Amino acid sequence: MISYEYCDSSDSFYFNDIQDFDFNPWIEVKSVSEKGRCVFSKKFIPKGTMVFRDIPYAAIVDNQFKRNICTTCFKILLESNRHNFQTCPSCFQVNYCSNYCKQYSKIETKHTELECKWIQDFTVSFKHQMAEDDRNIVLLVLKILARRIHEKQSTIFHNKPLTTNTFETCTSNNNNIDLLPMIPNDIPDLIDHLDDYFINSKNNNEFENEEEEEEEQEQKGEGEQEENENNENNEKVKKKVIIIDDNEKEKEEIKKFNKIWKNDFKRLINIAKVIQIIIDDSIDSLENIKCDYGFVDNQGDTEMVDNSIDPKGLDKLVDNLSSSDLNILRLLCKIRANYFGLWNSAYKPIPLNSIDDDDDDNNNNKEKPNNDYLWCGSGVYLKLSLFNHSCFPNCTTLIEYNINKKNSNNNNGNNGNNNSYGDTNQLTISIITLRDIEENQELLITYIPLNQKINDRVKSLKSNWLFQCDCKRCHFEKINENQTEKIYKDSCCTNQKCSGGLLIPLEQNSTQGICRVCKNTYTLPTVFYPLK
């Protein structure tokens, strides 16, 4: 999922107590057939309205930016404030902009002793073997597990097996998404796609067997037809060609994504096994333990996985999953399906090896940010996970540490006592309406970058979230790819050097919108046909 920044004054929005769905004046959660939990408007909502806020359950700075961003406040580590930098003396993988942030760290970013130990083990034994995205999701899962153990919470995410059959266990009614509470208040309440992966793995094999039988029957039928064909029959066959071609395209599409999902499933199983090894106290040494699939070799090259073919050994991996493996795999799938990206201004990153005080070439943030944003971290937000996706969303997400960036940057020289935040959680994400929303209309955000063609958007959503987008933009672009181009571009920043995306209303009912990146303002469109 993608979350965006908003670097204007927080006075643009009225901060109601809107963190509780039960008392929220604007929105409510409903269950919709074939979609599950959705967020709908209780009444008419003007554009530019802040309708919801949520704090993360856990959040991390991504591995490649760990020397650039404070773990607590997610503020850029400015070179002028280097004398205040703090680093964990044990794992050397967690950094703070000040001693205050190190001590002030809230539970969602708190670096516990257990997490520190796990990070050390992961760094020594596995990190160099894994791709960047996989490293980050492992770190996020480890932080969640460490928090739950620190708070003496349950670490059971997968229901106890009712049978020795792994497939039956994972697809049993006890793991049915219909049994999840309407409002997620804990990690186990989050939806995951583990059952879908298991079902696809099983049904994919059956699908291929049925396809082979159909091909044999077709070949047999073609042989008989060749013996008895005549001109009249040939004409009938020609009329069916278009229908047959459409069916073949649909089958090929299903086969393609089945193989993508199976390869992804194997990767997730192996990541879960890595996590299980790290947290297993019974293993004395993690040296010489090798990752098995899609990881980085000794030369630093990522293994190329061909998603167009079935992965080898998946059936054996599934059959050998223990109850502990299933539990971690369930947690991993919940996190992967629900985490939000935390974005920040694009600065020159510090090299990951070390920082040389005398080497000015390695100094960070001497340059001004360019008109771009970087995915610099990840967070799990329990209630924000209820908002569904659209390729032309009527809402956007804004991060608190960017709303208050001006104030926080003025406190870099405060001898490391950056207490300007007070009780405000800098990782709070707010939902802002981009357009007027009618009563009983679903509120939607985006999970992906929107400046992509429909085929790329479909592939991204089906590969990562296992669903076919049926939003109006996709519907009309299937008919004519250019049909929605004008209204989409009219709703975005027109600065060619900017990647800001959809404009955000300056305030409630405003006719002007601001670009989240370059800060230019434009007149907002009033006609959204055919997407309204």
Swiss-Prot record:
BP GO annotations: methylation; regulation of sorocarp spore cell differentiation
One Pfam family recorded for the sequence: SET
Enzyme class per UniProt: transferase
Coiled coil spans: 199-240
Positions of the SET domain: 25-448
InterPro entries xref list: H3K4_H4K5_MeTrfase, SET_dom, SET_dom_sf, Znf_MYND
Acidic residues composition-biased segments: 207-217
Induction pattern: Down-regulated by phagocytic stimuli and up-regulated by Pseudomonas aeruginosa, PAO1 strain and PA14 strain infection.
Alphabetical keyword list: Coiled coil, Metal-binding, Methyltransferase, S-adenosyl-L-methionine, Transferase, Zinc, Zinc-finger
GO CC terms in record: nucleus
Spans annotated as Disordered: 204-234
One example GO MF annotation: methyltransferase activity
Known EC number: 2.1.1.-
ZnF MYND-type: positions: 70-116
Transmembrane feature ranges: none
Keyword Manganese tagged: no
Function: Probable methyltransferase.
Family in the record: Belongs to the class V-like SAM-binding methyltransferase superfamily.
Protein name stated in the entry: SET and MYND domain-containing protein DDB_G0288495
